[in-house]
């Protein structure tokens, strides 16, 4: 069995995923191919993975590295699973562009990696690279599974599912941590195992039902305590946006408050600057994290490539998916797939995040009941933008970029239609060769 890791320069994440594989008995003797276009980061990851293989896996795995476009097909050749963790354009210059150009128009963001104007342009510069990857896969590993971790998830997994021609699923961390994280924040005691039902779209999947092992419905207490937090006037809590979702829409969603603050037209308002403090919204949070991670990596990288590096299996889905397919031991995940009727009141071509059963037959998404009307409406605001962004990437027509931005709730609530067009033109120019030519 061969696993190819695209974007292996993401050393910490590569450690988590590949370390998980090495700690899975059925997968320990696999071939691991590391691919990146940055020679220094690739070498650091190679040193880390080989040390990890030696320390926790008795060198059972075979580890090789491949640098640059010229070696990409060799990295993919014969792969059974391809794990994608690339970031096109990195923090500098592209994340800086995503934040600084909109700021000139008075448009502020928190994360900008999934939805909003930042998510649109992150998708537009990434989809062409995914097309190169999957075109190569169809030639040298046509039966491989493509496990995508790169954001913006809904746009990328949506494109993969409709246009790539390879088996794929989009994977995020938010589903696994949603319920227990919420209960811990509200200090609600519960008995394991929890039974939950989550469905929606990536970063806006809805916790529709939650019961503890005794069959107790936990939502009444969740709603009560979330509203108590909001009414207390506290401003240093990190989940006030999602608690407002509970109060106003009745349900909690999977991704963090800093993400969801920029997914709608409620919270980041030039006209109401006091909302930033009221909801503890961290503007420019993602650039701040990037700078901190770059700084920390310089201090910590020796710990990762040092001989003593070790690992404990994480909750990342990748190793569990591979194990379930290889061993036919079923496993349930929250996966991002094309809707095709899975959630009846969302568009057929939308990328939805639903429960999926994984076994030797592959990744099989499970049909859901219709979402509550208000939740489907919230999801559709995002889906409209995501579908138009994919259409822009496929057709290379600039009008679809404009239309996606015009329909984005946050962008359109702050800027005029003419400003949105000018902003898109400025972002296209600033991205330069990171984008294909649009007409």
Positions of predicted regions on the chain:
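N-terminal Rossmann-like dinucleotide-binding module
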Residues: 5-29
